[in-house]
């Protein structure tokens, strides 16, 4: 029921990404999206509307339906400056790669073009950095190939970011990330009991706040929210295992 996750907005992008990675580790396929909305009080914003953007591979003909289909298929990357290219085993972002059981070595191809320097260009797999691509010269361009060992099901993406703010990017720091490429090895599911347990604790805290809250419009509104939390808890409890 969720077409994408807003990985970039008026938040800390690395912190948001860490939560996103946990959801991906639970087996959810969640493409990256971005957005800033447009609030009336612009003085409170750290950057203008459109500061964070989602780019979608929609083919040679651009129209609204193809663009939406590209978002849902995960053919996206999000950014406030750097532009990224990423493929794994000749598969593009958003693809599902199916491999036989056993160990494999897939070639990842990465590309970076940016109008500001970045300090890190990394391939993330199952929530961990699995490759760091060297950045040379002005740290604004890169093109490289890396061999990634793959032995279990999961996901891989490319991200770039800086350690500090860099004009003219009016954000905390330059940042960009592709959506994942998903890899299935044999019949292995993508699961993480630890990450599922993290969300169970999160749901417990939300439920406590919902029960204690006194600002509900009606009792049925509160009951509906609590019902949704019960459904969510059942999903993550099944993922967490016994």
Where are these regions (language model features)?
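C-terminal functional module detector
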Residues: 19-21, 25-31, 36-242
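Catalytic-loop motifs flanking and including active-site residues across diverse enzymes
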Residues: 16
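The substrate-binding groove and active-site-proximal loops of carbohydrate-active enzymes
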Residues: 3-13
């Amino acid at each position: 029921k969720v077409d994408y996750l807003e990985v970039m907005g008026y938040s800390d992008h690395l912190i948001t990404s860490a939560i996103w990675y946990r959801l991906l580790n639970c087996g959810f396929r969640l493409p990256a999206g971005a957005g800033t909305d447009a609030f009336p009080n612009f003085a409170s914003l750290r950057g203008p509307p459109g500061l964070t953007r989602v780019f979608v591979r929609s083919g040679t003909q651009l129209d609204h339906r193809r663009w939406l289909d590209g978002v849902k298929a995960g053919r996206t990357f999000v950014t406030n400056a750097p532009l990224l290219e990423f493929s794994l085993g000749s598969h593009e972002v958003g693809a599902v790669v199916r491999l036989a059981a056993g160990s494999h070595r897939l070639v990842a191809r990465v590309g970076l073009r940016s109008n500001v320097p970045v300090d890190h260009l990394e391939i993330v797999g199952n929530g961990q950095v699995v490759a760091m691509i060297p950045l040379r010269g002005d740290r604004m361009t890169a093109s490289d190939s890396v061999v990634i060992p793959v032995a279990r099901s999961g996901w891989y993406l490319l991200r770039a970011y800086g350690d500090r703010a860099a004009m003219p990017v009016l954000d905390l720091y330059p940042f960009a990330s592709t959506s994942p490429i998903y890899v299935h090895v044999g019949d292995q599911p993508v699961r993480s009991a630890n990450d599922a347990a993290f969300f169970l604790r999160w749901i417990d805290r939300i439920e406590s706040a919902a029960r204690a809250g006194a600002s509900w419009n009606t009792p049925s509104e509160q009951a509906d929210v609590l019902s949704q939390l019960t459904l969510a808890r059942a999903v993550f409890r099944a993922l967490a295992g016994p």
